[in-house]
Amino acid sequence: MTTFKAILLGIVQGLTEFLPVSSSGHLAVTQHLLGVPEDRILFLTILLHVGTLFSVFFVYADDIFMICKEFILMIVDLLTGKGIRVNNQYRKLGLLIIVATIPTGIIGLFFKDLFTSFYNSTLIIGISLLVTGTLLWTAEKVNTGKRDIKDMNWFDAVIVGLFQGLAITPGISRSGSTIVGSLFRGFNKELATKFSFLISIPAILGATVFEVKDVLEVGLGDFTLTMLIAGVLASFLSGVFAIRTLINFIKKEKLYYFSYYTWTVGSIVILFSLL
């Protein structure tokens, strides 16, 4: 393992975590090309996820601060006998993030082993990439939603959470699936994008907790402090770039551009799986 490889893995993690192209598949391919066994870099992988989390905190700092503030105030209201008062958009958004996380967590807990087994099938990965591309294309072409946060309800959050849960399938993009799920529910593009990135926080945190258990079993690995810092910084910076790039693409109604990429990669993967 070298610092250069750590930086390259960080860049791939940051870009593909938030661009709708499936991060798991790209990271696995990159590890293979670099000749780095997955079990030897689990600790680095966890830190790269932390770097991408910082990306979301950086881009949506104001929203996250207000959500946390209002959530604390809502708990204070509850403890002082005022009940749960959802009297502003940040309180509502915070509760809906929790609701969306529930189906995601259930799928992750009970079906993780099943979906993980799909990593052994390049055919399934290729087909999943084609599905991702088709969803992105369809959502961009047929959606005319204008629903805002005031129009959201718990059922919307559950549906988007289910989309996020199914994204543990290798080849299915988490950001792509949640944005598509939001657009299918009629959200406006700004809300669909924001909600997708905000619900990624508990999802990434949860996945990271599961990975910590694996790290304790295989060890931290042979890394220098320079390697770790370089990798995390690379994942953070590339993550910020990816989030802002995706926001720009969605504003310009060019989300379907990513369809061409996932269709191409998916077709290549399927072709190789059949050879």
Curated annotation (Swiss-Prot):
Membrane topology: Multi-pass membrane protein
Keywords: Antibiotic resistance, Cell membrane, Cell shape, Cell wall biogenesis/degradation, Hydrolase, Membrane, Peptidoglycan synthesis, Transmembrane, Transmembrane helix
Similarity remark: Belongs to the UppP family.
The protein's enzyme class: hydrolase
Organism in which the protein naturally occurs: Alkaliphilus metalliredigens (strain QYMF)
UniProt name for this protein: Undecaprenyl-diphosphatase
General remark: Bacitracin is thought to be involved in the inhibition of peptidoglycan synthesis by sequestering undecaprenyl diphosphate, thereby reducing the pool of lipid carrier available.
Pfam families with a match to the protein in the record: BacA
Task performed by this protein: Catalyzes the dephosphorylation of undecaprenyl diphosphate (UPP). Confers resistance to bacitracin.
GO molecular function: undecaprenyl-diphosphatase activity
